[in-house]
């Protein structure tokens, strides 16, 4: 990267903590190099306490854009000037665009688009399908919105945090009003309802942190009877590449198991396009992500 840094180089950032596991710097910097773009992507260890100062830094330094990850995806909302329609609906942001570097910051959410492109890449269509989705944080809400926009027949949402259920219910109401998709919300602690939903679903999506450290030995599904030859299981965790859930689903004969690497690639590609105006060369970037 040092060979192409100059006084004209445009900076893009990542604001999150922890950041050491992130694949984004490698992906974006390789894409800049492939396309000959004079950009550089740097990750900054920023939590909610430092977030306001970091956002002001984007404005002051003319940083052209930033990716935003945990724990900042919702906390950044009041610090921005505008939101895309999807980001406003989801109530979370993972990409900030500073158009022309002039300090007007617009928040976008690309998680949902990334997830659906990853599924399509694996030959999985969501149109007219019944889908169970566990975990309705920033990423989960974005995926739910995109599933509804892309024509899912029914989305059964499950979430463990009772304090979040009321805010998610507002999203459920909006999706039922704006789309033809039937969307419901239940507590993940209700295992009877959870198991029934999976039995009736074509696709199960785990958008929780279960499966990644320190929860790498846990799985939301432990009953082999829930895994069927016509069930697709998608875990948005990408480290480890095969979570306990995916290993269990593979062992018991799921139609297909998909990890989060494809979602990382395609949400990154969408963010790349928003910030640079160029298409990320995804075929060249895929090998950097390792085995899917």
From Swiss-Prot:
NADP(+) binds at residues 135-139, 236, 260. SUPFAM superfamilies: Aminoacid dehydrogenase-like, N-terminal domain, NAD(P)-binding Rossmann-fold domains. Its EC number is 1.1.1.25. It catalyses: shikimate + NADP(+) = 3-dehydroshikimate + NADPH + H(+). Shikimate binds at residues 22-24, 69, 94, 111, 238. It holds the Pfam family Shikimate_dh_N. Pathway: Metabolic intermediate biosynthesis; chorismate biosynthesis; chorismate from D-erythrose 4-phosphate and phosphoenolpyruvate: step 4/7. Keywords: Amino-acid biosynthesis, Aromatic amino acid biosynthesis, NADP, Oxidoreductase. The keyword Oxidoreductase applies. GO terms for molecular function: NADP binding; shikimate 3-dehydrogenase (NADP+) activity. GO terms for biological process: amino acid biosynthetic process; aromatic amino acid family biosynthetic process; chorismate biosynthetic process; shikimate metabolic process. The active site is at residue 73. InterPro entries: Aminoacid_DH-like_N_sf, NAD(P)-bd_dom_sf, SDH_C, Shikimate_DH, Shikimate_DH-bd_N, Shikimate_DH_fam. Involved in the biosynthesis of the chorismate, which leads to the biosynthesis of aromatic amino acids. Catalyzes the reversible NADPH linked reduction of 3-dehydroshikimate (DHSA) to yield shikimate (SA). Belongs to the shikimate dehydrogenase family. HAMAP family: Shikimate_DH_AroE (MF_00222). Homodimer. This is Shikimate dehydrogenase (NADP(+)). It comes from Streptococcus pyogenes serotype M6 (strain ATCC BAA-946 / MGAS10394). The gene is aroE.
